[in-house]
Amino acid sequence: MYKRQAELCRKFGLPDKKQYKDYSTGMKMKLCIAVALAHHPKLLLLDEATNGLDPVMRDEVTDLLLDFTRDENHSILISSHIVSDLEKLCDTIAFLHKGRLLLCEEKDALREEYALWHGTAAQLAALDVRVYGKRVTPYGAEALVRRDAMPAGAELAPVSIEELFVLMVKGECAE
């Protein structure tokens, strides 16, 4: 195991002569991942694994995690508030808010299933479909809707996972 850990530390560019207390936050996270991977796990459980990292270090850590999951026998269960990391790493996304599971679905299916509708507040009020979240401003309105519920020809925009989460929460999901 120690040989594998040393090999991973070299691969991750971690200095072997530096003490842990002198490592940056990103280096500490890489070391934690190296130690975890040294045990040849099939499943990694990660809580806010990229929290507090600068964008470059966050990208390096998510790349390491992606390499791990390229083996179909490996999985990661990750909790994070950094939605871009979830979009990069996850095949399936579960969204919890105030202890309630709002959704749990494959990431690509979520993008295909939901869309953003844009129009005026009056058009939104007249919309005859279930709205999963909405935002009304002096400049217009947007609504999170299911693509298949909208009339043919309705102009819809793709929704990011972050927009989906924000509209479900701020837009009073399932009012």
Task: Give residue ranges: language-model regions.
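Conserved protein kinase catalytic domain
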Residues: 2, 9, 62, 111, ...
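ABC transporter nucleotide-binding domains
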Residues: 3-84, 88-97
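A generic structural signal for secondary-structure junctions
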Residues: 13, 115, 122, 169-170
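Non-catalytic surface loops within mature trypsin-like serine protease
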Residues: 31, 121, 147-149
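Short, surface-exposed beta-strand/loop "edge" segments at domain boundaries and coil↔beta transitions
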Residues: 44-45, 123-127, 149-153
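ABC transporter nucleotide-binding domain
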Residues: 62-145
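C-terminal coupling/interaction segments
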Residues: 132-175
